[in-house]
Curated annotation (Swiss-Prot):
Gene name linked to the record: bglF
UniProt-listed PROSITE patterns: GLYCOSYL_HYDROL_F3
Keywords for this protein: Carbohydrate metabolism, Cellulose degradation, Glycoprotein, Glycosidase, Hydrolase, Polysaccharide degradation, Secreted, Signal
Region annotation Disordered: where it falls in the sequence: 723-751
Name assigned to this protein: Probable beta-glucosidase F
E.C. number: 3.2.1.21
GO biological process: cellulose catabolic process
Entries under Pfam families matching the protein: Fn3-like, Glyco_hydro_3, Glyco_hydro_3_C
Length: 867
């Protein structure tokens, strides 16, 4: 979501234009199967036709039938920025016991509060390739959010996916692959919602760069122009799995998609999300990402956050009272409002939040116990705002396990690692130490001082404590000398047996904060180490015979200046470790655990290895067009197609031991005797309501009502005057209709046609620890599709993975991976359906420890062989 900075709010929200998105002219060439702009799709499909949601929708619909116009509208509109304890909150319905729903960040912990856990972010979780940890972290996030009284925790993030290596918020997601994002995201959702908290999957969709994601005084926000097949096979894939997991809410992105704003893009929200994917929850805007009133409601937006209009902090809104007016004058059908309110309440009921769910016991606006209840109001009533509830439990154990099991060993010449406790160590780099100003001194982590634990922005969290690498190493070794500086000391001595450990990092974040010339994206730093980190490594390599590099990074980095230097014996990527930075690292450095992390992205030799189309768009004026001309070929898919050997491939990661893959087998589980899945079932019934425009009195101010200045209400001063005027007609978009559609052939359930998720093949492989130390291995399964499908496909696509338990030397474990029909399918842009090779003929499945290190080949119809 957006930041809480008042300065940012005023500067960035002023210039929004209110033009219809369909009015933008397309001035660039497009593929024949692409859309110049998102075509219309109306009306918004009703929710409630999925059997698993039937009980929740029945409860919600009974309530909505008895609610007034103002009560329904109140559910859909935030109360305004700084008008409550959370990042945002909806209006309440006291008559039915519906509280303000607290919507709060974030994806790695409860933001701007106390006694919380600062977990490792998504990119670190992805590097573990550990499904159990992915779900466990989700459970812990849910427990902490619920414990603080958060109704909707704004995560996980599966967009951006990492199309652009310099992208500022890539670290919030799980890696540069749709299946990795999908598996990690859906397991996170399952864990979070098992606690009764509502998860919010974001940012929908194609939000791959921070710079120009929103309009400025001189530049309109960019449009992500992506063709239909690429959208389905890359960017939609993780959202589909999140919907299949039953996610209760979704956040629309700031950017346009095919020249239509994400929050009022009827093709994306009505057609693809709510009809094709069968999404049953509610869609909210990102903060100040709702750019219109009627257009957004008709296009499928259900909640406007934080509620304010084009000029925040003045108490106006595109929705709120204006939505009440639009209902009374018939511009927005009552049917649409009923569905909006029902979707919100259905999610509330589905997660059991009607059963003694706690109210917010914190304030994101102050650390004081008492203060204004509505900080955005000049004359706010005051009261207790912080109860300092400790929600940490034993979640530090999970946080440490994730940070530890994500650590990725890239190089280990002469087996210099693990270290011995009596080794003579010289430690260099500020990244080993703490922020001298305090671990939480920079708002939303908007600085790069000390060890890098997370990126900056609304996806960050306050650290309850921080164990730095310096502290952890000093606790273990009495032979360590620390030089916490980014300039190599001229007077340092180097003994023949000394080992230099150099800590460097690369940072990024959200664009409302600029850090050292980087406005979110890594525009200034590029993929290089910050604070002259590359020079620090080279200086150490000139002085010492043995150098170990520890890299904390948000994503891909360049290492060519020093990776092949003879003294550089070992390289560890520790990603973003959160609060357990020190202990997780020493667990691996000193050999209590073998490293078992794998790269969730490719590390290139040069930025020129990437296609030009994934560079940051830095156009200074006008409307920015970001054309996804690379199609399906991002990250490792591109490197393979272009024949470029990266420095380290996707999925790469060494261990202190070795593993053998053997005794693989493949067995068919369900029929693939047709190219397309079995036809979908018709939609089930949905709640029915009166479509009559309600009495104007339902939008009138209650008598003797005590208004709070700037608080956004659904009431009208003159509701009778809002009635329809036959002389004025609203200019509805092309294709507008109020007739419900039967739904696309690719739909039929949450995530799409249920037949897509039939298990087509089960693959087993035995993994044996053949080394001398205990450790864990990751089996990665990549699919190669045959040419018979008639379309170009990437040579290998990750579709599944499993991680072993800790295996003792000589110990084995059999891993099972299931491959669905969808895993073997391509999106047919003509049929508008998923197409698989009949009987799986010609499909190859490769199993290995990275995309470039294959150990087993399984061919459908032929069996498996060890390579």
């Amino acid at each position: 979501m957006a930041p809480s900075s008042l300065k940012w709010t005023l500067l960035c929200a002023l210039p929004w234009t209110l033009a219809s998105p369909a009015s933008y002219n397309v001035h660039h060439a497009r593929d024949s199967d692409a859309q110049a702009f998102s075509p219309p799709y109306y009306p918004t499909p009703h929710g409630g036709w999925i059997a698993d949601w039937a009980e929740a929708y029945e409860k919600a619909s009974q309530l909505v039938r008895n609610m007034t116009l103002a009560e329904k509208v109140n559910l859909t509109t935030g109360t305004g920025m700084y008008m409550g304890p959370c990042a945002g909150q909806t209006g309440s319905v006291p008559r039915f016991g519906i509280p303000n729903l607290c919507m709060h960040d974030g994806p790695l912990g409860v933001r701007n509060t106390d006694h919380n856990t600062a977990f490792p972010p998504g990119i670190t979780v992805g590097a573990t390739f550990d499904k159990d940890l992915m779900r466990s972290r989700g459970v812990a996030l849910g427990e902490e959010g619920r414990g603080k009284g958060v109704n909707v925790l704004l995560g996980p993030s599966v967009g951006p996916i990492g199309r652009k290596p310099r992208g500022g918020r890539n670290w919030e997601g799980f890696g540069a692959d749709p299946s990795l994002q999908a598996i990690a995201g859906s397991l996170t959702i399952e864990g979070m919602q098992s606690t009764g908290l509502i998860a919010c999957i974001k940012h929908f969709i194609a939000n791959e760069q921070e710079m120009h994601r929103m309009s400025s005084v001189v530049t309109q926000g960019y449009s992500s122009n992506v063709d239909d097949r690429t959208l389905h096979e890359l960017y939609l894939w993780p959202f589909a799995e999140g919907v299949r997991a039953g996610v209760g809410s979704l956040m629309a992105a700031y950017n346009d998609v095919n020249n239509s704003a994400s929050s009022q893009n009827s093709k994306m929200l009505n057609d693809i999300l709510k009809d094709e994917l069968g999404f049953q929850g509610f869609v909210m805007s990102d903060w100040f990402g709702n750019y219109g009133g009627v257009s957004a409601a008709l296009a499928g937006l259900d909640v406007s956050m934080p509620g304010d209009g084009a000029i925040p902090l003045l108490g106006d809104s595109y929705w709120g009272s204006e939505l009440s007016r639009s209902i009374l004058n018939g511009t927005v059908p009552v049917d649409r409002l009923n569905d909006m309110a029902t979707r919100i309440l259905a999610s509330w009921y589905k997660m059991g939040q009607d059963q003694d769910y706690p109210l917010p016991n914190f304030s994101a606006n102050t650390e004081d116990a008492e203060g204004p209840l509505y900080p955005g109001a000049v004359f706010s009533p005051k009261g207790v705002v912080n109860k300092f509830v400790n929600v940490q439990g034993d979640h530090n154990v999970t946080a440490r396990a994730i940070a530890r099991d994500a650590i990725t060993l890239l190089k280990n010449n002469n087996n210099i690692l693990p270290l011995h406790r009596n080794d003579s160590l010289k430690i260099f780099g500020t990244d080993a130490g703490t922020n001298p100003d305090g671990i939480n001194s920079c708002s939303d982590k908007g600085c790069n001082k000390g060890v890098l634990t997370m990126g900056w922005g609304s996806g960050s969290s306050k650290l309850p404590y921080l164990v730095t690498p310096q502290e952890a190493i000093a606790n273990i070794s009495s032979h360590a000398e620390f030089h916490i500086t980014d300039s190599f000391p001229s007077d340092v001595s180097a003994g023949p047996n000394d080992i230099a450990i150099v800590f460097i990092n690369s940072d990024s974040g959200e664009n409302y904060i600029t850090v050292e010339g980087n406005p979110g994206d890594r525009t200034s730093a590029g993929l290089n180490a910050w604070h002259n980190g590359d020079d620090l490594v080279k200086a150490a390599a000139e002085k010492f015979r043995q150098v170990v590099v520890v890299y904390h990074t948000v994503g891909p980095v360049l290492m060519e200046e020093w990776i092949d230097l003879e003294p550089v014996k070992a390289v560890l990527v520790a990603h973003l470790p959160g609060q357990e930075a020190g202990w997780s690292l020493t667990d691996v450095l000193f050999g209590d655990y073998s490293p078992s992390g794998h790269l969730p992205y490719t590390i290139p030799r040069s930025e020129s290895d990437y296609p030009d189309s994934v560079s940051l768009i830095q156009q200074p004026f006008g409307r920015i067009q970001d054309d996804y001309t690379e199609g399906l070929y991002i990250d490792y898919r591109h490197f393979a197609k272009a024949g470029i050997t990266p420095r380290f491939p996707f999925g790469y990661g060494l261990s202190y031991t070795n593993f053998n893959f053997s005794r693989a087998s493949i067995s068919a589980q369900s029929s693939l005797d047709t190219a397309y899945p079995a036809p979908r079932s018709p939609k089930g019934s949905t709640p029915e309501y009166s479509t009559a425009i309600p009495p104007a009195a339902e939008a009138a101010w209650p008598k003797n009502f005590n208004r709070i200045w700037r608080y956004l209400y659904p009431y009208l001063d003159n509701p009778e005057g809002a009635r329809a005027n036959s002389s004025r007609k609203y200019p509805y978009p092309d294709g507008y209709s109020t007739v419900q559609k039967p739904g696309p052939r690719a739909g039929g359930g949450e995530g799409g046609n249920p037949a897509l998720f039939d298990v087509a093949f089960s693959v087993q492989v035995q993994v044996t620890n053949t080394g001398a130390r205990k450790g864990r291995a990751v089996a990665q399964l990549y699919v190669e599709l045959p040419d018979s499908l008639g379309v170009d496909t990437p040579s290998r696509q990750l579709r599944q993975f499993e991680k072993t338990k800790i295996l003792a030397p000589g110990e084995s474990q059999v891993l099972t991976m299931e491959i669905t029909r969808k895993d073997l399918s391509v999106w047919d842009v003509v049929a508008q359906d998923w197409k698989a090779p009949v009987n799986g003929e010609g499909v190859k499945m490769w199993i290995g420890e990275s995309v470039a290190d294959m150990r087993v080949l399984c061919t459908v119809g032929e069996g498996c062989s060890t390579l």
